[in-house]
Amino acid sequence: MPNWCSSSYVLVGSADEVKKLYGIMKKLERRKKAFVENGFGITWLGCLVDALGEDWKKVSCRGEWNAVCKRGNTLRFTTETAWGPCNQVFDLICRKYPSIRYYFQSEEPGMVEYLTNDKEGKYFKDKYCVDVYTPEKEFKHKHFLDEQ
């Protein structure tokens, strides 16, 4: 059983390329059955890799996307993936759609990882994440913008 990683993504590019990618993702979401057998369902990242014309066996795609929405030249969604973010999928998207760049924020508590590639904080302002169990056995989870 893997540790699960929750990630949020923002993909930004030309309105045309973002619209094409969004169309592919929405078409996959409307399917009754995934055309690539898997344990995740119709929104498995491997289905997206396959729909982009690539071999899902050569890309780390061990998870699924959720809640995709498009606004102008921006696409936003979340993923639940095993052990860490599956950025190979998004690197592939950037090769297929040269104008698109992706930004992400991910948390994988089992591996004590909090990651982002948004150095300027344009989409994800938090730079630090802390999980604490108090002596009273209370769990606290907080994000911070800086070291203070």
Please place each PLM-identified region on the residue numbering.
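Intrinsic low-complexity, intrinsically disordered or marginally ordered coil/linker segments
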Residues: 1-148
